[in-house]
């Protein structure tokens, strides 16, 4: 598309119904934020300029959204959508192209829908083209009124409609494409003569000569978020889109109503996702895996043929054909190799685990480098913290630890070392067997003091 296109995203609203200290547009949604999802809807367009009008929490919005090609314009006093667009006028001086205006709280828009609106606007040679939809319950939305030729005659906010006007089910989707020189001529004439005393952008439409409407195919796309309930509804819609796309691409999702997956997650065909599984962020899962039930993966990479159930993995990596869980916890920096077993109540943090290594139950491995074909006995603990500093442990290939062993860092165990059960190892062991425990003492005639007679 021509680069003579600019976009204005309206993100200055107070969002009072969210009842939050966080700006509404920064609330998390499907792996990003509401505002980032709106910006993603502009992805198919070549924009000359992109402006975000900010108000409430402006610095927070700038901090999260700052990126090349995006400019922030502050609306210090929130006096309506028309007033918000007026704040951009000095930044588009001399601009002769088209301007898209869209709300920053409408995260369900598809890029193809926005691109289609621009294409239709150009084919109409209109002064303005708006996105509209017919919905069963139009309450809360501005109504679009057409003339006999199908052109937009007027858009009236819901609160300003009469009872008869509210029966109109054609609603304003809050997405506009304007010929900027035409809009510039009428913006100063906007009036605050309405119930809220605000300057409404739709009030500019009757002042323009040629205004058209384009119907959106999926009315859900123009869904706006004003409170936590609507945020949850938008989340459910986006999750359904993601799950449908994955299932059509060859992923089995056993119960879609009990699975959530961010659209940023990548899953290859022939993966089975069990119920109560939640996949977040930059997670990538290779083919042939079984994930869940009862599993959370965040920013985690999983190799082919691996099984993970009833476990939590964050910013971790698991190689191919390994088994994780049940009830394992892989914390950031965990890097588990191929053909490994990480079992019941095992926690791994900031540690690399070599191929064919097993930690089957009740172990903690933190800040460690572990070789291949290592076997951790039940209850093996890598003691990495001295109360002030973390220290590393290096464990060579083929090491075996007995049950209830403690490896106190900093420590190095050479290839093939065996640690006897119950040992607390505090010094490096280059090879062989290490036994580091108190000698067992048996007193067969011992009695508790309260059981002893006076004769002893």
From Swiss-Prot:
The record ties this protein, via InterPro entries, to:
Bifunctional_GlmU (IPR005882), GlmU-like (IPR050065), GlmU_C_LbH (IPR038009), Hexapep (IPR001451), MobA-like_NTP_Trfase (IPR025877), Nucleotide-diphossugar_trans (IPR029044), Trimer_LpxA-like_sf (IPR011004)
Report the GO terms under cellular component.
carboxysome; cytoplasm; membrane
Location, primary (coarse class): cytoplasm
Q: In which pathway does it act?
A: Nucleotide-sugar biosynthesis; UDP-N-acetyl-alpha-D-glucosamine biosynthesis; N-acetyl-alpha-D-glucosamine 1-phosphate from alpha-D-glucosamine 6-phosphate (route II): step 2/2; Nucleotide-sugar biosynthesis; UDP-N-acetyl-alpha-D-glucosamine biosynthesis; UDP-N-acetyl-alpha-D-glucosamine from N-acetyl-alpha-D-glucosamine 1-phosphate: step 1/1; Bacterial outer membrane biogenesis; LPS lipid A biosynthesis
Q: Where is this region: Pyrophosphorylase?
A: 1-228
Return one Gene Ontology term, BP aspect. Answer: lipid A biosynthetic process
Q: Which cofactor does it need?
A: Mg(2+)
Which enzyme class?
transferase
Q: Which reaction does it catalyse?
A: alpha-D-glucosamine 1-phosphate + acetyl-CoA = N-acetyl-alpha-D-glucosamine 1-phosphate + CoA + H(+); N-acetyl-alpha-D-glucosamine 1-phosphate + UTP + H(+) = UDP-N-acetyl-alpha-D-glucosamine + diphosphate
Instruction: Provide the active-site residues from the annotation.
Output: 361
Q: Where does UDP-N-acetyl-alpha-D-glucosamine bind?
A: 10-13, 24, 75, 80-81, 142, 157, 172, 226, 331, 349, 364, 375
Q: Which UniProt keywords apply?
A: Acyltransferase, Cell shape, Cell wall biogenesis/degradation, Cytoplasm, Magnesium, Metal-binding, Multifunctional enzyme, Nucleotidyltransferase, Peptidoglycan synthesis, Repeat, Transferase
Q: Which residues bind Mg(2+)?
A: 105, 226
Tell me the disulfide pairings in this chain.
none
Recorded family membership: In the N-terminal section; belongs to the N-acetylglucosamine-1-phosphate uridyltransferase family.
Can you say what this protein is called?
Bifunctional protein GlmU
């Amino acid at each position: 598309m021509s680069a003579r296109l600019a976009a204005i995203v309206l993100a200055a609203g107070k969002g009072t119904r969210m009842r939050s200290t966080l700006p509404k547009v920064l609330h998390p949604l499907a792996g990003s934020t509401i505002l980032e999802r709106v910006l993603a809807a502009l992805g198919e367009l070549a924009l000359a300029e992109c402006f975000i009008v900010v108000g409430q929490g402006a610095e927070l919005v700038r901090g999260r959204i700052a990126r090349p090609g995006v400019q922030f314009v502050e609306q210090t006093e929130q006096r309506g959508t028309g007033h918000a667009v007026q704040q951009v006028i000095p930044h588009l001086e001399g601009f002769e192209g088209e301007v898209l205006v869209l709300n920053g709280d409408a995260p369900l828009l598809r890029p193809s829908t926005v691109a289609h609106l621009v294409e239709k606007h150009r084919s109409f040679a209109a002064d303005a083209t708006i996105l509209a939809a017919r919905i069963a319950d139009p309450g809360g939305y501005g109504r679009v009124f057409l003339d006999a030729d199908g052109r937009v005659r007027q858009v009236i906010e819901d609160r300003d409609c009469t009872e008869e006007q509210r029966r109109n089910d054609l609603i304003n989707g809050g997405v506009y494409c304007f010929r900027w020189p035409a809009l510039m001529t009428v913006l100063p004439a906007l009036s605050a003569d309405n119930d809220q005393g605000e300057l409404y952008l739709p009030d500019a439409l009757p002042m323009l000569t040629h205004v058209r409407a384009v119907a959106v195919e999926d009315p859900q796309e123009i869904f706006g978020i004003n409170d936590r309930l609507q945020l949850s509804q938008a989340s459910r819609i986006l999750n359904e889109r993601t799950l449908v796309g994955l299932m059509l691409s060859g992923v089995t999702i056993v119960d879609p109503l009990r699975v959530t997956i961010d659209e940023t997650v990548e899953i290859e065909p022939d993966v089975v996702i069990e119920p109560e599984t939640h996949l977040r962020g930059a997670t990538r899962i290779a083919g042939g895996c079984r994930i869940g039930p009862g599993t959370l993966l965040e920013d985690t990479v999983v190799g082919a043929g691996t099984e993970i159930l009833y476990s939590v993995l964050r910013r971790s990596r698991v190689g191919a054909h390994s088994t994780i869980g049940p009830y394992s916890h892989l914390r950031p920096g965990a890097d588990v190799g191929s053909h490994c077993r990480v079992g019941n109540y095992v926690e791994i943090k900031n540690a690399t685990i070599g191929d064919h290594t097993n930690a089957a139950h009740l172990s903690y491995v933190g800040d460690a480098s572990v070789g291949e074909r290592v076997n951790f006995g039940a209850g093996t603990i890598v003691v990495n913290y001295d109360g002030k500093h973390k220290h590393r442990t290096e464990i060579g290939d083929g090491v075996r630890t007995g049950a209830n062993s403690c490896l106190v860092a900093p420590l190095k165990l050479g290839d093939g070392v065996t640690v006897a059960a119950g040992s607390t190892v505090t010094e490096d062991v280059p090879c062989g067997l290490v036994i580091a425990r108190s000698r067992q003492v048996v007193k067969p005639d011992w009695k508790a003091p309260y059981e002893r007679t006076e004769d002893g």
